[in-house]
Regions:
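Bacterial Sec-dependent N-terminal signal peptides
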Residues: 1-21
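Short strand-edge motifs at loop-to-beta-strand transitions and within beta-strands
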Residues: 525-527
């Protein structure tokens, strides 16, 4: 049985998205003036429904530089048609890789390396003014002359990442909402390898995981590289081991990895390259959990297809199902010999690397056209996803979208832009919010940034937000400890938790070692389970009418419990620390009694939750 996500209630919505957005694929919606060479288009939607767009081009005489525009949920530009262009710094004549992130306080941050070799971050308020001045903030003590990345925090600040190709270092720091800098973190290698292509995903408690590549030159343009992950807190403390996700491979330096958060504090990682098993090119999937530990044992990764040397499987883009937390990955297939075929596939993976749709599902068949710019987004409440792609002759193209349900079956097909012309598409998606997603592109023939909205049913223009599903709250304070009765020589684990409100239909207790799933009545908030000495992992969910919750968390933030039941020869340690303050008493069935005084109890077996002499909260079984 798959674990399901606890759905967060969205605010009630009483309006319908309409106004400027059009329902005509032949016209679309004008968003900003751009030159014909504009590119590197990024898009991000704020919690309030406004969307920021960033593109790069030669403008204002200061080199290849970013420009930004803000639109509301109706598709109406909120700034001048030329957008906002930070022009304080002189930029190089090429792109080192710019970044953009919408912040939780409704602003936007852009980050870039200047021609002088410094990394700069600039924050722009919703009204177009500069929160930190147009000059922005110089990061990393002046280091970092190459590509940048940004990740929004939960308090209006951002994580920023910079790269020094010259030194082979990655630099990371957290910028507070007011522009205050936290300590710079340097990721480097003592043996002389380069640390490159850092990407960031959120870790619990507003921390960050950095997924990066360690590489050293092999020959010509080939490098031996592996993929690693390491976690940090805002004050620069390393919070997880530096873990290898992918074994070293010798591949072209241009093949780099991508990441997508799994919604549980970890992330999926994927990369396509020609050096592994299967086709001449294949896409490989990895995963790490909220502790930064790899959950896929094969360090070669799991391929989207098994053995198929006659075909390439590449150009992937992925999303995560918000309910099951599975990875949904879309990718292009073409024949190895002539590369004349073009199909779009999707496949599904869980966190252990199980390929749930076997060899994938074809969602766009070969039709003599080239399919490119593949993107994918899950519906905001699950139940399906949208695959976006362009279709054309490789230069002129149209924009299409296809709705797919959880079984991989097409449910709708929409042409978003029907006029065929050369275009540069956005590099990412903004995700569904209130039932709406947005695609954007630059018209390479005449210039101009254009966009189109689309709903969960493939509709454009007027979109009615969906009704949020009933929330699935998990239990909390999942605790437990070992128990041993020397008279009967019976050992057990005693578990307890705090019930969610409202109560579920029942709880599911997952016993990892025995692969059992035990159903527990909703009236109980503790459970006694006999086990032989050994180490046991338990997980707990709440089961509702329409969904199953996320796993319950322990007081220290883990979504599982490890109970060590010692051998019978050493069990005296279990009872040594006596309970001095009884908090709650349950009967053997897990029902809470109305007393915390043992003397008030009738004869029988009870479970006591209390505080010991050392201040530890424990759960123990007694016979009255």
């Amino acid at each position: 049985m798959k674990k399901l996500f606890s759905i967060i209630i969205a605010l009630a919505v009483t309006f319908t998205v309409k106004a400027q957005w059009v329902n005509n694929p032949a016209t679309n919606t004008f968003l900003a003036n751009t030159s014909t060479d504009a590119g590197e288009i990024y898009i991000a939607t704020c919690p309030n429904g406004d969307t920021y767009l960033q593109w790069s081009s030669f403008v204002g005489g200061n080199g290849w530089a970013p420009t930004l525009q803000r639109i509301n949920s109706l598709g109406e530009p909120q700034w001048d048609n030329d957008g906002v262009h930070p022009s304080y710094h002189q930029m190089a004549s090429w792109s080192q890789g710019f970044a953009m992130a919408a912040t939780s306080d409704g602003a936007v941050v852009t980050c870039f390396a200047t021609e002088a070799g410094h990394t700069v971050a600039t924050k722009i308020n919703p009204d177009g003014s500069y929160a930190w001045g147009e000059q922005g903030i110089t990061l990393f003590d002046g280091y970092g002359e190459s590509r940048t990345e940004l990740l929004a925090g939960d308090d209006g600040g951002v994580w920023a990442l910079g790269t020094s190709v010259d030194l082979g270092n990655i630099y990371v720091c957290y910028i507070e909402a007011n522009g205050t800098l936290n300590p710079t973190i340097t990721i480097s290698d003592d043996s002389g390898k380069l640390c490159m292509f850092g990407l960031m995903v959120p870790a619990p408690n507003n921390n960050v995981f950095v997924v990066y590549e360690k590489e050293q030159w092999a020959y010509t343009y080939f490098y031996e590289k592996d993929i690693r992950v390491v976690g940090y807190s805002k004050d620069g403390t390393q919070i997880s081991d530096d873990v290898q996700l992918m074994s070293p491979l010798t591949i072209s330096g241009s093949y780099t990895h991508y990441v997508v958060p799994d919604g549980l504090g970890g992330a999926y990682v994927y990369i396509w390259h020609p050096a592994g098993q299967g086709g001449s090119f294949n896409t490989y999937v990895f995963h790490f959990n909220q502790n930064g530990a790899s959950t896929i044992l094969d360090l070669n990764g799991i391929p989207v297809h098994l053995t198929d040397p006659a075909n390439f499987y590449l150009d992937a883009y992925a999303t995560v199902d918000p309910v099951s937390h599975d990875l949904i990955i879309a990718y292009r297939q073409t024949d190895e010999q002539f590369q004349s075929e073009s199909r779009v596939y999707v496949n599904r993976f869980n966190e252990t690397g199980e390929r749930l749709w076997n060899e994938g599902i074809v969602v766009v068949e070969e039709n003599g056209q080239t399919h490119s710019d593949i993107l994918i987004d899950a519906f905001e409440y699950g139940d399906g996803y949208t695959v976006f792609y362009t279709e054309g002759d490789g230069y002129y193209s149209t924009v299409k979208a296809m709705g797919i349900n959880d079984n991989g079956t097409q449910i709708w097909n929409t042409t978003m832009s029907s006029n065929s012309y050369p275009r540069t598409m956005c590099r990412n998606t903004c995700g569904y919010l209130e039932g709406q997603n947005i695609m954007a592109w630059v018209n390479v023939s005449s210039g101009g940034l254009y966009g189109q909205n689309i709903g969960l049913n493939g509709e454009m223009g007027e979109i009615t937000p969906p009704t949020p599903p009933t929330p699935c709250y998990p239990p909390t304070n999942f605790e437990g400890e070992a128990y041993y009765n020397p008279e009967t020589q019976i050992s057990a684990a005693i578990l307890s938790w705090t019930a969610p409100d409202p109560l579920p239909l029942h709880y599911n207790l997952y016993c990892e070692e025995t692969k059992e799933i035990i159903e527990i009545d909703a009236e109980y908030t503790s459970y006694y389970i006999e086990r032989e000495p050994g180490d046991y992992i338990f997980k707990l969910t709440a089961w509702y009418e329409d969904c199953e919750s996320d796993f319950a968390h322990s007081p220290n933030g883990e979504n599982y419990l490890i109970i060590e039941i010692p051998s019978h020869e050493s069990v005296a340690e279990i009872e040594y620390d006596e309970i001095v303050n009884i908090v709650e008493i349950y009967n053997i069935n897990g029902q809470l009694t109305n007393t915390s005084n043992i003397n008030d109890l009738n004869q029988g077996v009870y479970i006591i939750k209390g505080v010991t002499e050392s201040g530890k909260m424990v759960v123990r079984k007694i016979i009255r």
